[in-house]
Amino acid sequence: MSRAVVDAKEFSHAMSKISKVLKKCAIPFLEEVCLRIQNGRCTLTATDLETWFTAELPASGDDMFFAFRKTKDILRACSHFAGELTMEFSETRSGSKKVGKVLLRCERRGAEFEVYDGADYPNTPQASEGDAFSVSSARLSACVERVRYAAEKPSVSARPAAICVQFCGNSVYALDGTRLACDTLEGVSFPKPFLVRADVLAHLSAFGKEDM
C-alpha cells in the first residue's frame, strides 16, 4: 500500500479546475482525471485528446500513479474535505490487468474508490525545449476574448486556420477570410508562431488570474 498527503482544499481546487475539459466520451479514460505523485509533487491531468490540462501541488509520502474511475464523485467528496487529505492507494493483479483502489481520508471523513492503472492513461505531449513560455492567464484570456469573434465557427467546410486564434511574436490575432482582429501582449514573446482553436481557448477561464 502507498500513502501520500496533500492539502484537501488545494487538491479539490485543482481537480475542479482541470476537470472542466472533461466531457462524455465512449473512451472511459477521457472522462477521468489522472493522478501521479512523484518527487514531492502531485500532478493532475485531464484531456479530451485535443486539449490537455495539468495542475501541480505539493505532496508528501509515497509515489503513486492511477486514473480515477468516477471523477465527478471524487469532486463531490473532496468538496467536504478540509485540512490534510490522506490518500491510501493499493493495487492487485486480475489476470494481466492491475486493479486498484484509493481511500481518501480527511479527519473523520473518508471514501474509497476504484481506480484505473495510470499506465493506460494517454501520455501528455511534451513541449520541445525552448517552446514553453509563461504568461498571466487573465491577460492572455482578455486578449483572446478581444480577437476570437473574428474566428470562424468550427464546421466541416471551415479552413483549419480560420477557426483558430494565432500567436506570433507578441501578437494575438484571428482571421476568418473576411474579418481580422489583432491585439498585442506587452512583455510577452511567443517562442514561435502557433495556432489554437478559438473554442478551446475558452478553457483559459479555468486558470483564473494565475500564471501558467
Language-model segment annotations:
Residues M1-M212:
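Structural preference for solvent-exposed beta-strand-turn elements
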